[in-house]
Regions:
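Bacterial lipoprotein signal-peptidase II cleavage site
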Residues: 38-51
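Conserved C-terminal helix/tail region of periplasmic/extracytoplasmic solute-binding proteins
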Residues: 329-360
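N-terminal secretory signal peptides
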Residues: 1-19, 26-36
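Pocket-lining segment of extracytoplasmic ligand-binding domains
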Residues: 122, 201, 206-293
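Secondary-structure end/capping motifs
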Residues: 263-336
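Short helix-loop capping/hinge motifs at secondary-structure junctions, enriched
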Residues: 157-164, 194, 260-269
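Short, solvent-exposed loop/beta-turn-alpha elements that line the ligand-binding surface or hinge
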Residues: 89, 141-145, 244-248, 313-318, ...
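Short, glycine-/small- and polar/acidic-enriched structural segments
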Residues: 48-191, 202, 218, 238-240, ...
Length: 360
């Protein structure tokens, strides 16, 4: 699947963005090499690199603050905010650093090798518990019945129709330690499934459908936008969505920032959060147009691109965070009292949250 690089972004960028992208071109090309190398590293390798060199120094281009961000093929508000011009009129711009594997995003935010990243709440909680310097600064996607965060697929001829049928089978998801693992295991245990009898393997979302079709997995958990392609595959059937499993409580995918960047560039963080919130609200109001933009970005047939929904104004609320603190404690992954909800997030940089607070 073609992946948009900084150079292709420059070629296709609207005139209002082209000059800024040219300005960052040299930085982005160098950073892309580093980002791709880091994507293949283990969590331990990333930690060692950061320990040896310290947090990455924040780069500036002219009077613009450049924040380092992955250039992944996905439905992401940073790319949409950039495309929609929501960084125009600010002193802040994204500096895309190449594709970074999903499991590496939060570890690299925690070390400062990238400045922002979007991954699920349990990964952020675990990183904070281990001493990483990061914080959630904006909410992200939300699960609706008509717009789930993730969907569960099997082959039509698999004979798998209920949770108990999964014992002895192989489940593919995009990473351990996140929503796909913990929401699924919680649900399966509620239905008396012995999860130790299930083989869990990591498969990137963009490869999950094909891996299931070819029989290398028995159930695939796939996130939007790629889940739409599996919905349209003739040989597959959808069993559930995460809305069926927990009513959507575990579906918030927030945006986190490195602590050093927050402390050094609070105005840039406000710029980013405001742009994200505007983009999220735009997606909620323009779902079909958003799908078209993402289809173009990831080079996928529009009919196969699943829609997204976002938390209004991207204001972070506490229940989704407490939900995962409780799960991590029950899984033995987090000591009681090690991380409190308030340790995980802040709405300080969200102008919409400040407006809500002023009204109340």
């Amino acid at each position: 699947m073609p992946i948009e690089t900084p150079s292709t972004s420059l070629a296709s960028a609207p005139p209002s963005r082209r000059l800024a992208l040219k300005t960052f071109a040299s930085l982005a090309s160098v950073a892309a090499i580093g980002g791709l190398a880091l994507a293949g590293c283990s969590r331990e390798d990333g930690s060692k690199s950061a320990a040896a060199g310290g947090p990455a120094v924040v780069k500036k281009t002219g009077d613009k603050v450049a924040f380092k961000y992955p250039n992944n093929p996905s439905f992401d508000l940073i790319y949409l905010a950039d495309e929609l011009g929501y960084f125009e009129g600010t002193n802040t711009r994204p500096e895309y650093v190449g594709k970074i594997a999903a499991p590496q995003i939060i570890p690299l935010v925690g070390t400062g090798e990238i400045d922002f990243g979007s991954r699920m709440v349990p990964l952020v909680i675990s990183a904070i518990a281990s001493g990483a310097d990061l914080k959630v600064v904006a909410a992200g996607g939300k699960t609706l019945q008509e717009a789930p965060h993730m969907k569960y697929f099997v082959r039509k001829d698999s004979g798998i129709r209920n949770p108990k049928d999964l014992e002895g089978k192989t489940i593919g998801f995009n990473s351990f330690g996140a929503c796909a693992e913990f929401v699924t295991k919680k649900y399966l245990r509620q239905h008396d499934v012995d999860v130790t009898k299930i083989n869990f393997v990591v498969i990137p979302d963009e490869q999950a459908e094909q891996t299931l079709v070819t029989g290398n997995t028995d159930l695939a958990i796939i996130h939007a936008p790629f889940s739409g392609r599996a919905d349209n595959a003739e040989s597959l059937v959808r069993l559930w969505s995460d809305f069926d499993l927990d009513g959507g409580l575990g579906g918030m995918a927030p945006y986190s920032a490195h602590g050093q960047f927050i402390r050094q560039h609070p105005e840039a963080v406000r710029d980013v959060v405001a742009a994200l919130a505007k983009a999220g609200n735009w997606v909620n109001a323009n779902t079909e147009e958003a799908r078209k933009l993402v289809a173009k970005r990831i080079n996928m047939d529009l009919k196969n691109v699943d829609r997204y929904a976002y938390v209004d104004d991207l204001v972070v609320t506490e229940p989704p965070i407490q939900y995962y603190i409780d799960i991590l404690q029950s899984e033995g992954k987090l000591a009681a009292g090690k991380v409190a909800v308030k340790d995980v997030y802040t709405n300080e940089f969200n102008p919409f949250a400040q407006q809500q607070a002023a009204k109340s």
